[in-house]
């Protein structure tokens, strides 16, 4: 998130912002997938369940924020420096790319965005990028495994005879693996809560 200008990426042209945002997303991809592409296994790389989820989250987040800003902030667009649909899309695209990869750059002050948009940004901060990337956060792989693990446990509760099998990237995961993921996410949110509590006590 470091830069040499005070207004971050807002200082640069629209073209530069698109290029930077795109490369932020690319660096949020698991580097092992790039290796598969380099050795000619492109189909195997693009079959990645985590990659599809990662890109889907980005696309959905961008369009929800775009629609939310347009529908709820029409009267405030000029004060935000957003004059047309292209700018709204660009700012949404860049902020989502920057937040989900835990980069820290920004092209606009999203403090003035609607509550839904800010909520999405907060969720993206916690999620982070793919495992094996430069991004931080919980990681998309853990998110997918946790949801599948929850679904498997629900089916087990409904039908005790059901043989629980949690699959990820075409492989059956051991129960200890899903338990480790649940433990990590629980610890992550617990520490986040503790840090927020400490900060709220120290702020005046």
Annotate each language-model stretch with its function:
Residues 2-204:
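Membrane-proximal intracellular helices of multi-pass ion channels
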């Amino acid at each position: 998130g470091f830069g040499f200008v005070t207004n971050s990426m807002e200082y640069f042209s629209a073209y530069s912002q698109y290029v930077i945002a795109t490369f932020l997303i690319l660096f949020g991809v698991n580097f092992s997938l790039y290796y598969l592409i380099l050795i000619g296994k492109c189909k195997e790389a693009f079959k990645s369940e985590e990659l599809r989820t990662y890109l889907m989250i980005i696309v959905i987040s961008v369009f929800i924020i775009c629609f939310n800003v347009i529908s709820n902030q029409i009267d405030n667009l000029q004060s935000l420096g957003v004059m047309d649909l292209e700018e709204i899309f660009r700012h949404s695209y860049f902020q989502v790319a920057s937040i989900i990869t835990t980069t820290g750059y920004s092209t606009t002050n999203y403090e003035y965005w609607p509550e839904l948009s800010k909520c999405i940004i907060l969720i993206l901060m916690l999620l982070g990028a793919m495992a094996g990337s430069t991004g931080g956060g919980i990681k998309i792989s853990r998110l997918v495994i946790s949801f599948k693990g929850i679904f498997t446990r629900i089916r087990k509760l409904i039908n005790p005879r059901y043989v629980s099998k949690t699959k990820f990237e075409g492989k059956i995961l051991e129960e200890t693996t899903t338990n480790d993921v649940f433990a990590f996410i629980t610890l992550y949110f617990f520490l986040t809560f503790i840090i927020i509590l400490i900060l709220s006590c120290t702020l005046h």
